[in-house]
Regions:
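His/acidic metal-ligating clusters that form di-metal
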Residues: 140-159, 169-190
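N-terminal, active-site-proximal structural segment of metallo-dependent hydrolase catalytic domains
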Residues: 2, 17-79, 91-100, 152-154, ...
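Sec-dependent N-terminal signal peptides
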Residues: 4-14
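N-terminal non-cleavable signal-anchor helices
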Residues: 14, 18, 182-185
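Structured helix-beta-strand junction loops
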Residues: 59-60, 109, 187-190
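A short acidic, helix-capping loop that chelates divalent metal ions and anchors anionic groups
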Residues: 37-40, 128-129, 164-167
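Structured beta-strand-rich core segments of catalytic domains in phosphoester-bond hydrolases
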Residues: 62-155, 159-161
Length: 190
């Protein structure tokens, strides 16, 4: 069985989506980097900003958020009562200074739709104490399987990849893309 994949990276605008075989489904999707670092590193009032981001997600069927590191409770306070949020991996105790993936996927879909979210952490990163410091986050991706009420399935990928402009950053992103492709191929073989 061939699966349908919708691969989205770093889009800041909503858009309408595709058809599956003979049935048309139209979604409003938001992909947004929330800039959710701890307050000590930013000065844009995340305690005020994150509930507003949560409220904005109510206008979309699917919201794929990145950098939801430190203000998830504030974000959740703005969600609709029917909203379903899946937060990415939270890291491990081996690095107490490291944060989780920062990924959050929020769904406002009609009744009868099934959502299954798998979180994967990248094996490669670039930057501990210089550059973008991406190794302090357990960055990765979410493979989201959505099943319609009539059992049509499709997948969406939410990811937050390595930042930076150095060769080591580009190499890490290349490895991260390979990781995503490998995970997709495993799904296609099922």
């Amino acid at each position: 069985m061939k699966h349908k994949f919708l691969f989205i990276i770093y889009l800041l605008i909503p858009f309408e989506v595709f058809s599956l075989e003979d049935e048309n489904f139209s979604f409003n999707i938001l992909v947004y980097n929330t800039h959710g670092l701890p307050e000590i590193f930013i000065d844009d009032n995340p305690k005020k900003r994150f509930p507003i981001i949560g409220e904005k997600t109510r206008d979309f069927n699917i919201s794929l958020l990145q950098e939801d590191y430190s203000h998830h409770e504030e974000l959740s306070s703005g969600l609709g009562t029917e909203s379903i949020a899946y937060r990415g991996g939270m890291g491990t105790f081996l690095c107490p200074l490291c944060t989780g993936s920062g990924l959050t996927s929020i769904f406002n879909l009609p009744d009868g739709w099934l959502i299954d979210v798998e979180n994967e952490t990248y094996e490669d990163c670039s930057g501990w104490l210089r550059g973008a410091n991406d190794c302090f986050a357990y960055k990765g991706f979410q493979i989201i399987k959505i099943t319609t009420p009539n059992e049509k399935e499709f997948y969406i990928i939410n990811t937050h990849m390595d930042a930076g402009r150095r060769d080591s950053d580009r190499h890490a992103r290349e490895k991260q893309l390979e990781h995503i492709v490998s995970a997709i191929k495993k799904k296609e073989d099922i």
